[in-house]
Each structure stands twice: as structure tokens, then as C-alpha cells.
């Protein structure tokens, strides 16, 4: 009977990296390449985003100035947030390509070094890559299903209800979308832009998910090292090795802090843009639903809500990891069995763990589920006010 070869954690990690690189490479932003620099595809994507912004401005002009319809502003701005998010992720990650590679390669080195040690280390790696892989696939399905439905809605309306409905809420200058040919060209442009936007946003999100979900991995391996350290301390017969292992624990905690600081440095602005534009998009989409101006609005509303809570959930993940790290150092470490000099090292590490780095939206608000709840309350209040206004 043939047995399937076991896939090592490092191989699964590299598989995740390849999938992310394919998505971001689709938009010319493969920052994992040591020789990365912006090239024609990168600039083409930026030009496409600029084209979308210009067409959105034109759409607002036509609606407000020519047709006298102020509601077109809300309709046109509903999906602008996604474009702003994509452009921000592209520019920020391209500008921080070296830091992106540093974090990515650090985690890969951890997989290579500790995957070969087996036992508890291998379990930590397998658990973490399983969580990461599940998150990536789950979010991919969200993108494919919801954005796919947004694209197919106009086809359904055209074939079944014989109505011409736009995929995205923007017009192209000098193109008459009321004709069959004009509507087809406009729909094709919408589909192309939303496809590129989906790939780009997904790839940008996955790098953040990869980095944040692997922060607890360092904490988990620290716990295994601490268990080995305690066992050696209780033997009381190899103090030089005890001191060496203690120094290793200090280095590991510094690595945890450095990975958090680097991730925050890269994504602080991205997270601010993500939260702010998602909230604006939610408000505009809710307005479209009340005005019955965009049949696919409920789908985009669901996508935006999932995005908001997923990103805030990442912040809570980091907060929980920090609390666990502090608890492990304080309760699991046999610091009282060490000489005074070594106890001071533990106290220093404990003091640092009490003021650990957390993810924020440009240092303006912590990224957490509590923040998501507060934003949801504000959006709910706006929805009730709009409902009363529209009667």
C-alpha cells in the first residue's frame, strides 16, 4: 500500500508565498523578488486606477451638473474606496519591498530551522500554516463568490429582465452606454477593472494576513523553548547552558517585537486607508440600497462588512498574542529558581512585554474588534437617519 509523502511545513509556507506572488504579480507588484522594481505592468495598473478615478469624476459631473441628480455622488463613490485601498497597498508595499522580504524570509527561515526539529516545534509550525492557509482560502472564496456575483448581476438583468444594469457605478466619456455596443464596451471595461482590482487587493491583503497570523508563531515557539528552559533549570547541573538558553529566549522575544514593529511600520497607513474607505463605502452602499440605485449593492455591502471585521480581527489577534506572551513569561517561567543577575534579565523582558506593539490605523485608533464595533454603531446610526429621511 502506497503512503502519501508528508508535506513539510516549510513547503506549505512556500506554497502560500507562491500563491500570493502570483496574485500580486498579476498587478506588477511582486515585492518578493529581490530584484523588484516598478515596471510597465505596475504603471499600467496605476494608470487604470487613475482612469477609474477620472471616470468617477466624469460620472459625478454628468449626474449633478447635467442631470441635476445629487444621489449620483453616493452611487459613484460606493466602490471608490476599493480603488483607493488597492493603490495604497501597491504604493506602500512597493516602497517597503525590502522590509516585506525581510519579514517573509525571517518566517521562512523559522520554518526551515524548526521544522526539522520535529516534536512540539513541528506541531507549532503545522498549526500556524494550517490557520494561515484556511484564512487565505476563505478570503479567496469571499472575493470569488461576492465579486463574481457583482459581475454576473448585469448579465442576469440583461438576459432575464431585459434591463441594462452597470457592473460598477461609473461612465466613460464619449461612450454612449445606452446603445447595445456602448453598454457592452462599458461592461467589459468594468469587468477588467474589477478583476485586476480583485487580484491586487487580495494579494495585498494576503501579505498582511500572512505577517500578522505568523506573529503568534514566534510566541508559540517561545513557549516550547521556555518549557525546555524550565526543565534544564530544575536539573540544577548545567548553569552555562541555562544562561545560553536564557539569552536565546531574550533574542526570541526581541524577534517577536521586531516583527511586530516592522509589520506595523509597513501597514499602518494601509490599515488607516482600509478602515476609513471601507466605512465610506459601507455608507454609500447602504444609501444605494435605500435608493434602489444599484441591484448588486447588497453583495458589495456584505464584502465591505466582511473586510472591515476581518481586518479588525487581525488587530485583536495581535492583542491576544501579546497578552499570552506576557502571561507565559510571568506564570510559566521559573525565574525564581535563577540567580539574581538572571532574574533581572527576566524582569527586563517582562517589562518590555507589558508595553508591546499593537497594530493601529496610522496611530489614530487601535485595530481591534472594539474599533469595528464602534464603527458599526456609527454606520447603523447613519442608516437609521437615512431611513427616516427617505421615509
Curated annotation (Swiss-Prot):
It is found in: Cell membrane. Expressed in antenna. One of its GO terms (molecular function) is ionotropic olfactory receptor activity. It comes from the Eukaryota. Residues 1-45, 93-140, 186-191, 290-297 are cytoplasmic. The keyword Oxidoreductase does not apply. Residues 67-71, 162-164, 213-268, 319-391 are extracellular. The atypical heteromeric and topological design of the odorant receptors appears to be an insect-specific solution for odor recognition, making the OR/Orco complex an attractive target for the development of highly selective insect repellents to disrupt olfactory-mediated host-seeking behaviors of insect disease vectors. Odor-evoked OR currents are independent of known G-protein-coupled second messenger pathways. Interacts with Orco. Complexes exist early in the endomembrane system in olfactory sensory neurons (OSNs), coupling these complexes to the conserved ciliary trafficking pathway. Belongs to the insect chemoreceptor superfamily. Heteromeric odorant receptor channel (TC 1.A.69) family. Or67d subfamily. This is Odorant receptor 67d. It comes from Drosophila melanogaster. The lineage of its organism: Eukaryota, Metazoa, Ecdysozoa, Arthropoda, Hexapoda. The gene is Or67d.
